[in-house]
Amino acid sequence: MANIKSAKKRAKQTVVRNERNTGQRSMLRTAVKKVIKALDANDAAGAEAAFAVAQPILDRFSARGLIHKNKAARHKSRLTARIKAIKAA
């Protein structure tokens, strides 16, 4: 355990940030899973609606550094490709 006041504060901040980041990461995963679930059900309209919700979340969290920008780009690219494939079929 930290003895210095500033170290105690930093430890407390770390706990708070960890909880916040964990919750936000969970929200992100849930949003992406909703798109995938709609895609698996061949529901193009539902997938597009879910993707419209997931895309700004991916952008926002990559801008904040919660996930890497390339990971966000990869998710968006793959989901968009799957949505286009379902619409074309």
UniProtKB/Swiss-Prot annotation:
It comes from the Bacteria. The keyword Magnesium does not apply. PANTHER family: 30S RIBOSOMAL PROTEIN S20, SMALL RIBOSOMAL SUBUNIT PROTEIN BS20C. Signal peptide: none annotated. Residues 1-24 are annotated as: Disordered. The keyword rRNA-binding applies. Keywords: Ribonucleoprotein, Ribosomal protein, RNA-binding, rRNA-binding. Residues 1-12 have a biased composition (Basic residues). This is Small ribosomal subunit protein bS20. NCBIfam families: S20. GO terms for cellular component: cytosol; small ribosomal subunit. GO terms for biological process: translation. It comes from Xanthomonas campestris pv. campestris (strain ATCC 33913 / DSM 3586 / NCPPB 528 / LMG 568 / P 25). Gene3D superfamilies: Ribosomal protein S20 (1.20.58.110). InterPro entries: Ribosomal_bS20, Ribosomal_bS20_sf. Belongs to the bacterial ribosomal protein bS20 family. Binds directly to 16S ribosomal RNA. GO terms for molecular function: small ribosomal subunit rRNA binding; structural constituent of ribosome.
